[in-house]
Amino acid sequence: MKIIINKANESLKIDINRKLILPYAVGGLMYSPAIRTDIADMVITKKYKYLHSLAICLEDSIPDCSVEAAEKQLAETFRKLEKAAEYANIQDLPMLFVRVRSAEQLIRVYDSIKGSKLLTGFILPKFDTSNACEYINALKQLNTASRTVY
C-alpha cells in the first residue's frame, strides 16, 4: 500500500505494510445490500468519489427468502469488479468487506467469489462466545488454503 501525501505541491510517497495499517484504515464504511445489481458499476464509475471502504451485506439487510439470490449477485458483483480491475485497469478500488450471516456462509461466499484478491475481509455480525470458534476456524481454513483474509 502506498500513501501519497501532498503538501505545498510536494509529494511524499510512503510504502506501508497493509497488515499494519489495515486496523486503522477502514475509515467511514458504506453498507450496501448484496442483492443490489448496481454495486460494481457504482464502484467502477466512482459514484462516491471518496468511498474508501464498502461492506456488502448478506446479513440483516437481506430477507431470509432472498439469501441465495443475494449470494449469487455478490458473486456477479465480484466477477464484474475483477474484470474491470484486469481489463480496464481500474485502480484505487475501495476496501471490500462482506458481512456474512454465519461461518458456513463465509466459506461458501469465499468459494463463490473464487478467493477474489479484491476482497479485503469479512464482517462477522453478532460475534460472541457462542459462535467465535466457528468463525475463527472458518477464517483459519481460508487463510491456510490461500492468502490472508481479514
What spans do the regions from the language model cover?
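Expand to "…catalyze enediolate/carbanion chemistry for C-C bond making/breaking, isomerization
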Residues: 1-150
